[in-house]
């Protein structure tokens, strides 16, 4: 105990092995060791755990050599894997205080011998317990680092492990990618959360969607402030943003709308709703047009028709070159449920590990991969998440996914937007991943964009959106379901809005421009988030929800959600809408679906 206290005075703890060795030191040798540590502490005042490694260093090396090599050494990080911040300092003070109290009690002369022995025994046990805990944490860190290094070494050898003689046709085709910067909030965020921000946000949404509605109606809408003067008039057309939705006892739907100057009440008759002439799935904050008859009092409009700013119907986009695009999302590297074997198998497929002519043809012509968010599982996304992680360092999570993507053939261009598990703000629109993350990816042909973002990829206007608003829409619209993602995606296309309602489960940042409005007549809408694959074509727009590489989580079990992991959608960009244009790589097998 006396030896332990001498080192505690220096703010140094002894590992059990070192403690046993020091008990065999003669007094002079022990004194020299203590003096050398005391001199070293003048240059590095960190709390020291004297394990066998550092005991040998202090015994065998000159003091000047130790100071030069270890004066800036982060001992806290060496022991725990964490930087020395405020908490370790508090822990250091706490241990020092406890130690001083123990020593002071030990020096009290009137304590009875039996009590003193009992106290010493208990103190010895306490110190030993602290030592065991520190040693255990140190050993766990060493095991953890070794496991990580082994994992990284394996990932870096995926590409070279594939012996392929495929002729890479896509390698000779130039990538054509244009990012529509006006669709990406990255570097352009203006909101500070003021009332003025909210006013500008909703005004921008209203004005931009009003243009599409008036274009569809082929006429201008009346200002709502004029409706009161139009008592009894028919065929009156108005446009507004929905501020309230309610129903009457007899089943009519009451919808309040606003424009920039006034508000009005729309009455959607029950019989027209039941006949399918007008919809009943009106959402708060969406922008709609209405045609109807003004009441005799001028207080409301009886609606005959609802006009939404939906994308116009068209033929699906096709190009002349037969090349392929694959869609990923929700990879969730870092989660214990991450399907690393299946993900590795997919990367091997991309490198030419194929079993038949169809697979060889597709992989030889695959030119693009879009990733719609949640590359990693993140840290602190939900309470208790650390229990679900095999990698608790978010930088290392990104380093790992970067290493995986680096194993993909160089001629394949990769586009990445973030999701709610990624290291960006949770509120949408989300900026692209920060530089401290993107610098981990060692590829020239990788494009980082925000969420949402629209790009032109080889002639296809492609909108990437992670899909967090799906959690709100499923509860708001009867026709929308998790099991069939395209039922949700259709609702976005109808409204030209990726997240219609403010204040739901999907947080929205009130930018002065609403980046969640779908400005362009897109060719592809790519989403993720709900971990269930879905595919369809609506109004000529290819709708792809790209599933996941994460096994079913406990949360999904509680919610009754059954994911479809390790399925990768792939489209033939020359045959969209035709037989054989849509394929799925399903856990190692490529099959034509449509």
Curated annotation (Swiss-Prot):
The question of whether Nuclease is a record keyword is answered with yes
**GO BP:** DNA catabolic process; DNA strand elongation involved in DNA replication
Which GO terms fall under molecular function for this chain's record?
DNA binding; DNA-directed DNA polymerase activity; single-stranded DNA 3'-5' DNA exonuclease activity
Pfam families from the UniProt entry: Metallophos
Query: What are the UniProt keywords, alphabetically?
Result: DNA replication, DNA-binding, DNA-directed DNA polymerase, Exonuclease, Hydrolase, Multifunctional enzyme, Nuclease, Nucleotidyltransferase, Transferase
Quaternary structure per UniProt?
Answer: Heterodimer of a large subunit and a small subunit.
List the protein's name: DNA polymerase II small subunit
Q: Which organism is it from?
A: Methanocaldococcus jannaschii (strain ATCC 43067 / DSM 2661 / JAL-1 / JCM 10045 / NBRC 100440) (Methanococcus jannaschii)
Its gene is polB
């Amino acid at each position: 105990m006396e030896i332990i206290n001498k080192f505690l005075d220096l703010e140094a703890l002894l590992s059990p092995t070192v403690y046993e060795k020091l008990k065999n030191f003669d007094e002079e040798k022990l004194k020299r060791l203590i003096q050398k540590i005391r001199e070293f502490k003048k240059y590095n005042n960190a709390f020291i755990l004297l394990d066998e490694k550092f005991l040998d260093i202090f015994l065998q090396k000159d003091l000047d050599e130790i100071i030069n090599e270890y004066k800036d050494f982060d001992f806290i990080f060496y022991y725990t894997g964490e930087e020395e911040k405020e908490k370790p300092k508090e822990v250091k003070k706490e241990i020092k205080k406890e130690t001083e109290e123990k020593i002071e009690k030990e020096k009290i002369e009137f304590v009875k011998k039996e009590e003193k022995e009992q106290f010493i025994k208990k103190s010895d046990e306490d110190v030993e317990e602290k030592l065991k805990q520190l040693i255990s944490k140190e050993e766990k860190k060493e095991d953890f680092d070794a496991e990580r290094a082994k994992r990284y070494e394996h990932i870096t050898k995926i590409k070279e492990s594939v012996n392929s003689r495929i002729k890479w046709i896509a390698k000779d085709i130039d990538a054509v990618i244009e990012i529509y910067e006006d669709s990406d909030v990255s570097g352009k965020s203006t909101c500070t959360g003021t009332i003025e921000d909210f006013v500008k946000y909703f005004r921008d949404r209203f004005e931009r969607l009003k243009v599409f509605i008036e274009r569809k109606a082929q006429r201008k809408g009346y200002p709502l402030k004029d409706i009161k003067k139009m008592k009894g008039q028919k065929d009156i057309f108005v446009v507004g943003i929905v501020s309230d939705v309610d129903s009457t006892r007899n089943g009519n739907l009451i919808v309040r709308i606003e424009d920039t100057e006034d508000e009005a009440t729309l009455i959607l008759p029950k019989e027209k709703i039941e006949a399918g002439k007008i919809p009943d799935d009106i959402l708060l904050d969406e922008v709609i047009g209405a045609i109807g008859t003004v009441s005799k009092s001028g207080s409301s409009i009886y609606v005959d028709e609802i006009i939404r700013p939906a994308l116009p119907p068209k033929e699906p986009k096709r190009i002349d070159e037969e090349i392929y695009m694959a869609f990923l999302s929700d990879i969730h590297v870092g989660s214990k449920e991450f399907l690393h074997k299946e993900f590795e198998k997919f990367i091997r497929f991309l490198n030419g590990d194929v079993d038949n002519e169809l697979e060889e043809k597709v992989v030889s012509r695959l030119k693009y991969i879009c990733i719609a968010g949640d590359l990693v599982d993140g840290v602190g996304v939900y309470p208790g998440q650390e229990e679900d992680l095999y990698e608790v360092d978010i930088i290392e999570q990104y380093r790992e996914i970067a290493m995986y993507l680096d194993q993909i053939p160089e001629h394949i261009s990769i586009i990445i937007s973030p999701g709610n598990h990624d290291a960006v703000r949770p509120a949408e629109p989300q900026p692209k991943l920060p530089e401290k993350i993107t610098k981990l990816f060692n590829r020239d042909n990788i494009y980082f964009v925000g969420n949402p973002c629209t790009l032109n990829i080889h002639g296809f206007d492609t909108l990437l959106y992670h899909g967090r608003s799906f959690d709100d829409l499923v509860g708001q619209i009867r026709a929308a379901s998790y099991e069939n993602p395209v039922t949700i995606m259709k609702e976005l296309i109808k409204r030209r809005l990726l997240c219609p309602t403010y204040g739901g489960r999907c947080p929205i940042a009130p930018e002065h421009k609403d980046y969640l409005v779908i400005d362009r007549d897109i060719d592809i809408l790519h989403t993720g988030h709900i971990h269930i694959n879905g595919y369809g074509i609506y109004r000529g727009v290819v709708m792809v929800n790209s599933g996941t590489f994460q096994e079913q989580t406990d949360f999904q079990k509680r919610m009754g959600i059954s994911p479809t992991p390790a399925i990768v959608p792939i489209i033939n960009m020359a045959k969209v809408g035709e037989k054989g244009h849509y394929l799925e790589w399903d856990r190692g097998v490529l099959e034509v679906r449509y």
